[in-house]
Swiss-Prot record:
GO function term, MF aspect, one: aminoacyl-tRNA deacylase activity
Origin species: Synechococcus sp. (strain JA-3-3Ab) (Cyanobacteria bacterium Yellowstone A-Prime)
UniProt name for this protein: Proline--tRNA ligase
Family matches, as InterPro entries: aa-tRNA-synt_IIb (IPR002314), aa-tRNA-synth_II (IPR006195), aa-tRNA-synth_II/BPL/LPL (IPR045864), Anticodon-bd (IPR004154), Anticodon-bd_dom_sf (IPR036621), Pro-tRNA-ligase_IIa (IPR002316), Pro-tRNA-synth_IIa_bac-type (IPR004500), Pro-tRNA-Synthase_IIa_type1 (IPR023717)
Family that this chain belongs to: Belongs to the class-II aminoacyl-tRNA synthetase family. ProS type 1 subfamily.
Subcellular location per the Swiss-Prot or TrEMBL entry: Cytoplasm
GO cellular component: a single term: cytosol
UniProt keyword Ribosomal protein present: no
Top-rank lineage group of the source organism: Bacteria
Catalytic activities: tRNA(Pro) + L-proline + ATP = L-prolyl-tRNA(Pro) + AMP + diphosphate
Length: 609
């Protein structure tokens, strides 16, 4: 990597105002600082300063991957549809999530731009791995990925094109997979620490990559503007993405009702209105929520979920449960789960539905006879609802509710599931003395134990020591390189601009010449740049014919860790050394500059294992 650069010769343009397109401060600063330029929604050019940052992050990733025995390769970005159909994920990625760019070539063959590479790597393993003697294997790549986001936003955090490291491991057994998973866990921690980031590791939902039963953890960079909510205990014993989190809900209040009654409750279509009308706690109410599930065979299934009135539905957990029921409906996968609004309910072409007053036994007659609509409602009850006695719920009549109801008496208890959304203030399931707290995070890394999810449908196998054919055990491990760069900015900035961690800063030091027409200032600056570069210190030389104030503002904006200024103190044989992170400035003798910076940079790069 180039050790020194004149700023006057760089393609370098900064902006004084925040771009209208940017919402997050990190996005604004990357645009204003001349790091990125938008081509179209979700697609950005990485300009020279950011490219240096990305190269440094990539180098750190490579070093840590190589240290655990992973081998770098490069996989095709253009992938044939048949391998995605073989794994069973083509419809999931093109219809359900709809995030894959799909196209047809001139021969009419379906292709896709890879959002991920499990299919490609599994096919490669199927072709090349024959024996247990070849295992384990870990391959990784760093390359551009593509995802057709519905609403690209937040700059590099949710783009349609992004830089990512993805690794894949193959094993003879589950024990070997778990060992590599732990190796990756430790390597990811080292990567983020070396990049100077504060992070936490959380239990996570495996999504379409791992499936509902895969072990999975996310590496979250803590930031108030993060898209993901994290629930954690103060003692650090538990942390999870809210999609995966479990907890103990607060106990329900005692019911004042001892007999079953039907009451007139006009104008109480919501839990809040009903609780106020009856002067009871929402914890005594069973609310009944309608969803429509679409499976990959085209069948729509209406789901009625009963849950305690003070709780919210975790739709990720619900979707995972419905995915496990796919075989019941002669399907392979759930494609889509949608809250049933008025338009969807109308499409069922059945009896009118008493919205706001639905009971657990809503009749199946609300479903018309249609070819692709299951004739019976799938009824589920969250644990919070299943435990209630003498509860309040709808009556299937507009303007009326029932009180004093019980499962097994007025209503049959449906299949009991755990699909409530854990929330801050709940007690921790593992240690009820700990109360869950909340934070925001940006997902940077995600590791999965895939098990046999891909090897079985794609017939990727090996011969074991006994000569028997066995499926390959598999793991996958991703880290967003371009996301990491922006997350660092989101976590480390001030009112004046970016504060890059030393390890991933585009340059270690910027040398500012306040007055380029002063030959002494220029001469000293040139000598310092040469000496710093020779000592391995990456140096940006601001030799532009600009006002000193502009140069200082730009230096703060782009966040170079150290700034040297060849100003008035030259008469005393000194230059000013300012640290971007602290704002502290000192004057040091010119002959001590190299040694001082080497010492400071070495200290900043020394990260404990």
């Amino acid at each position: 990597m180039q050790r020194s650069q004149r700023l006057s010769q760089m393609l370098f343009v900064t902006l004084r105002e925040d771009p209208a397109e940017a919402e997050l401060i990190s996005h604004k600063l990357l645009l204003r600082g001349g790091f990125i330029r938008r081509l179209s929604p979700g697609i950005y050019t990485y300009l020279p300063l950011l490219w240096r940052v990305l190269q440094k992050i990539s180098d750190i990733v490579r070093e840590e991957m190589n240290a655990i025995g992973a081998q770098e390769c490069l996989l095709p970005q253009l992938q044939p549809a048949e391998i995605w159909r073989e794994s069973g994920r083509w419809d999931v990625y093109t219809q359900a999530e709809g995030i894959m760019f799909a196209l047809k070539d001139r021969q009419g063959r379906e292709q896709a731009l890879g959002p991920t590479h499990e299919e490609v790597i599994t096919l490669l393993a199927r072709d090349l791995i024959r024996s247990y003697r070849q295992l384990p294997q870990i391959l990784y790549q760093i390359q551009t990925k593509f995802r057709d986001e519905i609403r690209p936003r937040f700059g590099l955090l949710r783009g349609r094109e992004f830089l990512m490291k993805d690794a894949y491991s193959f094993h003879a057994n589950e024990e070997s997979l778990r060992q590599t998973y732990q190796d990756m866990y430790r390597a990811y921690g080292r990567i983020l620490r070396r990049c100077g980031l504060e992070f936490c590791v959380v239990e996570a939902d495996a999504g379409a990559i791992g499936g509902p039963s895969a072990a999975s953890q996310e590496f979250m960079v803590l930031a108030s503007a993060g898209e993901d909510e994290i629930l954690y205990t103060p003692d650090g014993s538990y942390a999870a993405n809210v999609e995966k989190a479990v907890s103990l809900p607060p106990p329900a209040a005692d019911s004042p009702y001892t007999t079953f009654q039907v009451l007139d409750t006009p104008g109480t279509e919501t839990i809040e209105k009903l609780a106020n009308f009856l002067k009871i706690s929402p914890t005594l109410i069973v609310k009944n929520v309608l969803y429509q599930a679409l499976y990959d065979n085209g069948l729509r299934v209406v789901v009625l979920l009963s849950i305690r009135g003070d709780q919210e539905v975790n739709e990720v957990k619900l979707a995972n449960h419905l995915n496990r029921l796919a075989e019941r409906y002669q399907a392979n996968k759930l494609l889509k789960l949608t809250l049933a609004d008025a338009e969807i309910q109308k499409s069922w072409q059945g009896d009118p539905i008493p919205v706001g007053y639905i009971a657990p036994d809503l009749p199946d007659s609300c479903l018309g006879r249609q070819k692709n609509l299951a004739p019976q409602i799938l009824r589920l009850a969250d644990q919070t609802a299943a435990l209630l006695k003498n509860f309040v719920t709808g009556s299937n009549q507009v303007g009326r509710h029932v009180v004093g109801a019980n499962w097994g008496e007025q209503y049959p208890l449906a299949e009991v599931v755990d699909v409530r959304k854990a929330q801050a203030g709940d007690r921790c399931l593992l240690n009820p003395d700990q109360i869950l707290e909340t934070a925001r995070g940006i997902e940077i890394g995600h590791i999965f134990q895939l098990g046999l999810k891909f090897s079985l449908p794609m017939r990727a196998s090996f011969t074991d020591e006994q000569g028997s054919e066995q499926p390959l055990w598999m793991g996958c491990y991703g880290i967003g390189v371009s996301r990491l760069a922006q997350a660092a900015v989101e976590q480390s900035h001030d009112a004046n601009g970016i504060i890059w961690p030393v390890a991933i800063a585009p340059y270690h030091v910027v040398v500012v010449v306040p007055n380029v027409s002063d030959p002494e200032q220029t001469k000293v600056a040139e000598k310092l740049v040469q000496e710093l570069a020779a000592a391995g210190i990456e140096t940006l030389w601001d030799d532009r014919d600009e006002r000193a104030g502009v140069k200082f503002k730009d230096a703060d904006l782009i966040g170079i860790p150290y700034r040297l200024t060849t100003g008035r103190s030259l008469k005393q044989g000194k230059v000013e050394l300012a640290e971007r992170a602290t704002g502290q400035a000192v004057e040091i003798p010119i002959e001590e500059v190299v040694a001082t910076l080497k010492e400071r940079i070495a200290a900043a790069l020394a990260v404990p294992d």
